[in-house]
Amino acid sequence: MAGRIVLLNALPLTAIPYDTATILVKQLSIERFREELRNFIEKGYEIVSYIRHKATVDLLEKMLNIKLNVSSELYKFSENDLVYIVTLAPEKVVRGQEITDLKPGDLIYYYVVIVKGAWI
């Protein structure tokens, strides 16, 4: 059985159920992000979004040709999760303003690996 892809706009440390964990974060290009997710989709991975920003969810739906839900649920890490963070580029953030029109280049894409224990 395939695992699940988790899409977040940030990684809350309270979502990690370990006393000690090692976290590796790798920034991805737009192309690499699309390619990785499309490959996982083809392999039958479930994609779960914990992103509540509608414009980001709408853009991801277009980029990946899938249906996602806007979600305000709390994420809890599971060992088989493949975690991706999709967040607004700092230069696009305007305090107190809702961004409604996004292009793929307005976002930054990360792949996150979370491992129980200290590996540093």
Sequence positions of predicted segments:
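Intrinsic-disorder/low-complexity peptide segments enriched for small residues
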Residues: I5-L11, E35, I66, N80, ...
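Acidic, low-complexity, intrinsically disordered interaction modules
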Residues: V48-V94
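N-terminal low-complexity, intrinsically disordered segments
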Residues: G3-G44
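Initiator methionine at the very start of the polypeptide chain
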Residues: M1-A2, I120
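Generic low-complexity, intrinsically disordered sequence content enriched
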Residues: L11-P12, P17, I41, M63-L64, ...
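A general marker of short, structured functional hotspots
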Residues: T14, S29, E36, E46, ...
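Polybasic, proline/glycine-rich intrinsically disordered low-complexity segments
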Residues: F77-I120
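Intrinsic-disorder-associated interaction segments
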Residues: I23-I30, R34, F40, S49-H53, ...
